[in-house]
Structures are given as structure tokens and as C-alpha cells.
Amino acid sequence: MSGEKVVKILCNRFGFTVSGYSGSHVRLSKADKGMKVGTVVPMHDELKPGTLHGILRLAKIDPEEFFRHL
């Protein structure tokens, strides 16, 4: 799965917004129950499974819930 697709799913389905760019990485954030939640997504053609799980962990999203939106 590409970084671009992950960003689209996080923004369209989970309410994240792009808060910045740094080289080939995109910072995403959202306010969740009074807390600010954020993650960084590398814009690679193919993300490794461990990288994707790390992104979801930082975003506080259950991987099963994320994969339901594919």
C-alpha cells in the first residue's frame, strides 16, 4: 500500500488533516477527545507492514478498523 493511499484513508475516513510536509514525509494531525493525535506518513510507493502498523499506532487507530476501509 502506498503512502498516498494511507494519507487519503486517514484524511477521508478518520478525520486527519495534513499539518505539514518534510521532504518525502507528510505530517497528519487531528483533535481527538481533547487530545491532539498525530502521525507521519512517508510518501513511498510501497510501505512495509511494520511501517504501516507504526503509523496506525501513533494515530491511535486499530489496524483491523483501518483495513475495513480499503
Q: PLM features: what roles do these ranges have?
A:
Residues M1-Y21, R27-L70:
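Basic nucleic-acid-binding interfaces
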